[in-house]
Structure formats: structure tokens, C-alpha cells
Amino acid sequence: MDMGKLMSLQKKMMEDAEKMQERLDATTLDGSSGGGMVKASVDGNGHLLGVTIQKEAVDPEDVEMLQDLVVTAVQEALEKAETMRADEQRKLMPANIPGIPGLF
């Protein structure tokens, strides 16, 4: 691959990476637990945006259950964000980079 093509490829990859970052920033992914009593929202980068808890999920006698519900909802949302990020990164990589098969 000549240097001009390599520089062009690098520039395109940088532009595509910026667009990917914008998509990740603009996307909200949700996780829930307890039949929807606890919901967590994250952006495509995995930053926690918020947690919503219905009052029916709050039992002062069973705080551990609520803690588990929150953790489960957040983990589900984070897993969705990780899947989205990995898919977006896969789209960025050209299929024919020599010497780096199966990078993603």
C-alpha cells in the first residue's frame, strides 16, 4: 500500500471514528429488572444517565433486593452499550488490513 493511500485511509478512519463517537453519545440504551420496576439508562459509551425505581420496588425490610435489581438493570444497559460499541468499531475497520486478520 503506498503512502498516499495509507494517509487517505487514516483520514477516513478518523472521520468515521468521530461520526461513531457522535452516534454513541446520542444513543440511549435501557436495561430493566424486576419486571420493569427498576430501569437504568446509559449512553452508547456506557455512561450511566439515570436510574428509575418504582415505589413498589422499595421495601425497607429488603434493601438487598432493591440493590440487586439496580445492579441487574445497570448491567443489562451496559451490556447493550458494549455490544453497540463493538458493532460500531467493527464497521470502522477495513476488511483488508494486511497482517491484522480478525482484529475485531
Predicted segments — roles?
Residues 28, 41, 52, 73, ...:
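Conserved functional loop/turn residues at catalytic and ligand-binding sites
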Residues 1-30, 80-104:
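Long amphipathic alpha-helical segments used for membrane anchoring, targeting, substrate engagement
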Residues 69, 73-84:
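Stable alpha-helical structural segments in soluble proteins, enriched in small hydrophobic residues
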Residues 51-63:
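A short interface-forming secondary-structure element
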Residues 32-52:
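N-terminal intrinsically disordered, cationic/polar leader segments
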Residues 25-28, 32, 37, 59:
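Small cofactor-carrier domains centered on a conserved lysine used for covalent cofactor attachment
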Residues 10, 46, 70:
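Residue-level signature of catalytic and energy-coupling elements of molecular machines
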